[in-house]
Amino acid sequence: MSNAAIRMEQLMLPTYPEPGKEEMPLFSEHRVHQRSTGRPYPNKVTLEVNRERKIERSYTVVHLENEYLDVLVLPEIGGRIFAARDKVTDYDFFYRQHVIKPGLIGALGSWISGGVEFNWPYHHRPSGFLPCDFETEECGDGSVIC
């Protein structure tokens, strides 16, 4: 394979769905999150976790691949790099989760471990568990962009 490939796929993962979000984010303003204060408005905040009910859920995955790397990006969960594998050594070089089980670590509540997430303006950013917009492009030189 001389060129990189990019494709959209569906990935089934065991998932613990988020419970309902706080309908009045004003009441979450005093929830301190790792030294950053509240004020989530206009975003709703998840204040609980679900540990009882697990479902199988399909996620849209952007799959990028060349002869050396195999990378999965989850745009539905903040655009995080969900998995990245070195094809030469068959080694996952980031921790790869095999279940989506949110904890209350994110700025708006839900957050998952594993992979790599873009963190701005601070760690476990507010949109880390929200869907993100994305585009894919196949370039003339054989590279791909997501």
For each of these PLM feature ranges, what is it?
Residues 6, 62, 71, 82, ...:
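A broad, low-specificity signal marking well-ordered, structured residues that form hydrophobic/aromatic
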Residues 12-15, 74-81, 98-102:
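A short, sequence-level motif marking secondary-structure junctions
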Residues 64-67, 86:
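Active-site beta-strand termini and strand-to-loop segments that position acidic
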Residues 1-20:
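Intrinsically disordered, low-structural-confidence terminal and linker regions
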Residues 69-72, 78-82, 89-92:
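Primarily extracytoplasmic ectodomains and periplasmic/lumenal surface modules that are beta-strand-rich
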